[in-house]
Curated annotation (Swiss-Prot):
Key word Lyase present: no
Keywords of the record: ATP-binding, Cell cycle, Cell division, Cell shape, Cell wall biogenesis/degradation, Cytoplasm, Ligase, Nucleotide-binding, Peptidoglycan synthesis
Keyword presence, Nucleotide-binding: yes
Binding of ATP, residues: 115-121
Gene Ontology annotations of biological process type: cell division; cell wall organization; peptidoglycan biosynthetic process; regulation of cell shape
GO MF annotation list: ATP binding; UDP-N-acetylmuramate-L-alanine ligase activity
Protein family (similarity comment): Belongs to the MurCDEF family.
Task of the protein: Cell wall formation.
Catalytic reaction list: UDP-N-acetyl-alpha-D-muramate + L-alanine + ATP = UDP-N-acetyl-alpha-D-muramoyl-L-alanine + ADP + phosphate + H(+)
Pathway: Cell wall biogenesis; peptidoglycan biosynthesis
Native source species: Moorella thermoacetica (strain ATCC 39073 / JCM 9320)
Record localization: Cytoplasm
Protein name as it appears in the record: UDP-N-acetylmuramate--L-alanine ligase
UniProt-listed Pfam families: Mur_ligase, Mur_ligase_C, Mur_ligase_M
The encoding gene: murC
């Protein structure tokens, strides 16, 4: 296995993924040679290539150069992949993405952010306040952070901030100094089987905290709050209600931002002003404040960093805004996330919110279609596409019509089932009007609809403005 200090040559199979590309960027900063393959070119592969990585856009055993010392694979890569087969024939170590993250993370003072929702934004905010505070952390984030112009930050300080992935249990390989948990919900049931097992995994995650470390827990979530008594380490709580250690009061949301007064126990720390919408983002920022404050960063420094934050890619990302009509894309793919995103959309002053939802995975749809049916109350129009399988085989009787039926059953009048992205884009081109906020939702490729509509609006110049 290549040495962390002296570098080596690591090859990534599936390097274009958000998690894989972030690790590749960290290794490049540490002096590694990096190569990788991914059939699809994207912003991450282009950025890595510009930074010195060798990128192949097909899977081939020939991509495995003689000098490669280690091969990293994503969860989507099968054992039959020709590069994996070639690596095993050469007796090269083949490690999972989570294993490499754990190796990098456990070699530094680790800050891990876990939870069903909000962990990408919260981990980005933690990294930003630490950077502003002069701690120069490395950061591995599950989305594009505009302030880093990347999904990773190659800081050379003692800390590494990581978004901890609970979906397959790999977050249990991490041994954090600080573990921040945003919330716990019934998701990834294809791996865990039950909510009780998910809660048990988070208890195990807290047990992984290093001696002298801390658990920072969101008191807004009852399941997370239930972990307080289970922690063998010091517990710090944060929330908007009750008496947590860190509290945001007087929350006011307006337009594309919000503000709140921040307290640490009985001490007033100051005013927080955010330039991203949604009460959930005040809560995400509060978690980052708790982490930064525990590390000794002054509140004024953190407030400055948080006030400059413009969001993470695919988290209420504005694709078009000409002053009246907006096209926004969001990764939300769970009922709780959809409700929070629609609540944020409702505050920006649109005449009509048009939600386009692409369900993600048959298993998630099977377990949560009733909850999805109740999640769209703040949308004026709802369009549901076919399920994005994410590698899953279809389940008998599980389809998008289950969701549209539930939405209609909740009393919603304008609900449309449009199977394909192409049909959806054609529909929106005809029906989009000034004052609309069109919101694409899902973890698959529904963003293509938003991007296509933004390009159409720009090309047609229906209203003045330039697409973003």
């Amino acid at each position: 296995m290549a040495d962390l200090e002296t570098g080596g040559w690591t090859h990534f199979v599936g390097i274009g993924g958000v998690g894989m590309s972030a690790l590749a960027r960290i290794l490049l900063a540490q002096g590694y040679r990096v190569s990788g393959s991914d059939p699809k070119e994207n912003q991450f592969t282009r950025s890595l290539e510009a930074a010195g990585a060798i990128i192949y856009h097909q899977h081939d055993a020939a991509n495995l150069a003689p000098g490669v010392q280690e091969v990293v694979i994503s969860s989507a890569v099968p054992s039959s992949n020709p590069e994996v087969v070639a690596a095993r024939q050469r007796s090269l170590p083949v490690v999972k993405r989570g294993e490499l993250l754990a190796r990098l993370f456990n070699a530094r003072r680790g800050i891990a952010v876990a939870g069903a929702h909000g962990k990408t934004t919260t981990s980005a905010l933690v990294a930003l306040v630490m950077k502003e505070g002069g701690l120069e952390p490395a950061a591995v984030i599950g989305g594009y952070v505009r302030e880093f112009a990347s999904n990773a930050y190659p800081g050379r300080g003692d800390f590494l901030v990581a978004e901890a992935d609970e979906s397959d249990g790999s977050f249990l390989w991490l041994k954090p100094e600080i573990a921040l948990i945003t919330n716990i919900e019934a998701d990834h049931l294809e791996h865990y089987g039950s909510l009780d097992r998910i809660v048990a995994a988070f208890k195990d995650f807290i047990d992984q905290i290093r001696p002298g470390g801390k658990a920072i827990l969101c008191a807004e979530d009852p399941r997370v709050a239930g972990l307080v008594a289970c922690s063998p380490r010091q517990v710090i709580t944060y929330g908007l209600n009750g008496r947590p250690d860190y509290r945001a009061t007087g929350v006011q949301m307006a337009g594309m931002g919000g503000r709140a007064a921040i307290y640490y126990r009985e001490q007033y720390l100051g005013q927080l002003t955010m330039a991203v919408p949604g009460r959930h983002n005040i809560l995400n920022a509060l978690g980052a404040i708790a982490a930064g404050h525990q590390l000794g960063i002054p509140f004024a420094v953190m407030a400055r960093a948080l006030g400059q934050f413009r969001g993470v890619g695919r988290r209420f990302e504005i694709l078009w805004d000409d002053g009246t009509t907006r096209v926004v894309d969001d990764y939300a793919h769970h009922p709780t996330e959809i409700r929070a995103t629609l609540a944020a959309a409702s505050q920006v002053g649109a005449k009509r919110v048009v939600a386009v939802f692409q369900p993600h995975r048959y298993t998630r749809t099977h377990h949560l279609y009733r909850e999805f049916g109740q999640a769209f109350r703040q949308a004026d129009v709802v369009i549901v596409n076919d399920i994005y399988p994410a590698g899953e085989a279809p389940l008998p009787g599980v389809n998008s019509q289950l969701i549209t039926g539930e939405i209609k059953g909740s009393g919603h009048q304008q609900v449309y089932y449009l199977p394909t992205l192409e049909e959806t884009l054609a529909f929106l081109k005809k029906s989009c009007r000034p004052g609309d906020l069109v919101l694409t939702l899902g973890a698959g490729d529904v963003w293509r609809v938003g991007m296509g509509l933004a390009q159409y609006l720009e090309a047609k110049q229906i209203l003045p403005g330039v697409g973003a």
